[in-house]
Amino acid sequence: MQEIKSPDGFIPLDIFVSSIGKERHTDKVEGMPGEVNYGTSYTSRDVELTMWFNAKDTIDYRLLRDELYAYFDSYDYLYVIETNKPTRALKIVIDNSFRDKRITTRVGEITINARTVDNPFWVSLYTTKELNDTGYDALVEKYGLVDSINSDNTKYKFTERNFSIWNAGNVTIEPETMYLKITATGTNGVLEIRNKTTGDTFKVSAEFGGDLVIDGMNTKLNGVNVFRDTNKRYTRLVSGKNEFEIIGQFTDITIDFRFYYK
């Protein structure tokens, strides 16, 4: 995520974020009263951005207004961060038109209605690899008190066969739609990764060895796609502690992901 400064003359005021919307899935069965409930799936959040702008004169006011319109039209999506919660971001899109509200000849206010895209969750700006490499104290110094991190569980790179990792978010990490990268070095091409907490097991049995990288739904061994040599299953990470067992030859294994929050 790259920080993008707002145009000169504009002062961001606030961000208002709704709860996550849900879509309920039901079906009607002939001869039965009511509907069959199949549960819900998350949709998106509504996000409202407010800002002021202060121009030099009435001509400059119009130029600033047009500059802001062009600014928000230049990006397909943006990440927004609350100043008082600087560790997490929301990915948003702005599809609806908006207009300024003129307060004086030089001062105006704009309210922009946006919504989340890809997933509706707050996501940590840092990854667990950064937490592992820099340590908890360095992360606190950079971001402040952060995100339910367990100070006793900040290790995400292991040489042991049995270990546990901590998902500080309150959302289960799903590799289909969220960032999760597992790297195992020094394998002989045959490896089994078990998350004993979720019951998920990933297996690969290739004809050559090397460094194994499972990046979301992509599996490569020494840069070669080996998806067909796997059991085509992936590992989720529930909120809190996840107990792992590794079976097979490896040098070290790193579990890199971001924390997600409702």
Predicted regions and their residues:
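Solvent-exposed edge beta-strands and adjacent loop segments
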Residues: M1-S44, A89-D100
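Charged, amphipathic alpha-helical segments
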Residues: K28-G31, I59-D66, T177
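Short, charged, solvent-exposed linker or helix-capping segments at domain edges/interfaces
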Residues: W122-E130
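Oligomerization/assembly interface segments of phage tail-like spikes and tubes
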Residues: G34-I59, R106-P120, N242
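Beta-strand elements of well-folded, non-transmembrane domains
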Residues: M51-A55, F98, T116-P120, G186-N188, ...
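Short beta-strand and beta-hairpin "edge-sheet" elements
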Residues: Y77-W122
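Intrinsically disordered, low-complexity segments enriched in serine, threonine, and glycine
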Residues: K129-K262
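Compositionally biased, low-complexity regions
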Residues: S41-Y79, R88
